[in-house]
Amino acid sequence: MSKANLLHTDNNMKIILFSEVSVGISANTILFFARLCKLLGENKPKPIDLYIAFLSLTQLMLLITMGLIAVDMFMPWGRWNSTTCQSLIYLHRLLRGLALSATCLLNVLWTITLSSRSSCLTKFKHKSPHHISGAFLFFYVLYMSFSSHVLVSIIVTPNLTSEDFMYVTQSCSLLPMSYSRESRFSTLMAIRETFLISLMALSSGYMVALLWRHKKQAQHLRSTSLSSKASPEQRATRTIMLLTSLFVVLYILERVVFQSRLKFKDCSVFYFVHIIMSHSYATVSPFVFICTEKHIIKFWESIFGRIVNI
């Protein structure tokens, strides 16, 4: 078995991983319920609020699944059978892909929503929610097929010592793939991620141009002695730009760590760092929404105020 199976002996790694998962679950829960209450309180809910709620729910489920997997990595209470291994690892892979798609499609929807009336994107404003929903369903089916290899590649960890198996948890291991199959799978993953990140880059480029235009307008307003307070569009643009920048930086770091893990033959340290990096966006991104949108802060202040009064 690979060196990564020594993870369960390191208490520091266990504390760091469970802390990340706990913080991420808490943050996504706060964001999800704040958005859900906003959606239920509006006569005509905004599509952007619906997709933010969906993204937070997807990330919440991803982190819960990772928490269950982490339990078997660090403190197994009993050996999982093959069905449990395959189901949880498959669900985790599927949710990671859906979180990536939801992030990208939210970026695109936000760009279309914030586009000016003179923009070429205006004609998509009323149709975009339906198109985004259709695109997400397409990606869902696509990821189900992409992740299906897990159902035949994940096995119960054998008792014998072997370097052929890649460690996943104390109970689960990954069978080695043939070179042709691994190349085909890697190519499909690369095409998927390149497409989604390119789409995010294009929409982010448009957002930069939009933010620059708003800045010019703000300078003009200041020169005419009118209020220079940032508009909701400017705040939304800055939020999505911050999220995109955060996603790209963390994605690049994750890829570097993943390649290092393969190079150093599944070293436990690189395996652990890769897990942390691959879930860092799901943990950090809710705080960007929470800190930049005042209504979420006010919502939870009112909730805690009622609890204290009781």
Curated annotation (Swiss-Prot):
GO CC terms of this entry: plasma membrane
Deletion phenotype: Mice show a disrupted pattern of axonal projections to the accessory olfactory bulb. Mice lacking all but one V1ra and V1rb gene (12% of the V1r repertoire) show a lack of chemosensory response to a subset of known pheromonal ligands and changes in maternal aggression as well as male reproductive behavior.
Annotated tissue distribution: Expressed in a subset of sensory neurons located in the apical layer of the vomeronasal organ.
Designated gene of the protein: Vmn1r49
Any matching Pfam family: V1R
InterPro entries: GPCR_Rhodpsn_7TM, Vmron_rcpt_1
Domain of life of the source: Eukaryota
Function: Putative pheromone receptor implicated in the regulation of social and reproductive behavior.
Stretches of the chain found on the membrane's Cytoplasmic side: 34-50, 115-135, 212-238, 291-310
Keywords assigned by UniProt, alphabetized: Cell membrane, Disulfide bond, G-protein coupled receptor, Glycoprotein, Membrane, Pheromone response, Receptor, Transducer, Transmembrane, Transmembrane helix
Residue ranges, Extracellular side: 1-12, 72-93, 157-190, 260-269
Disulfide bonds: 85-172
Protein name: Vomeronasal type-1 receptor 49
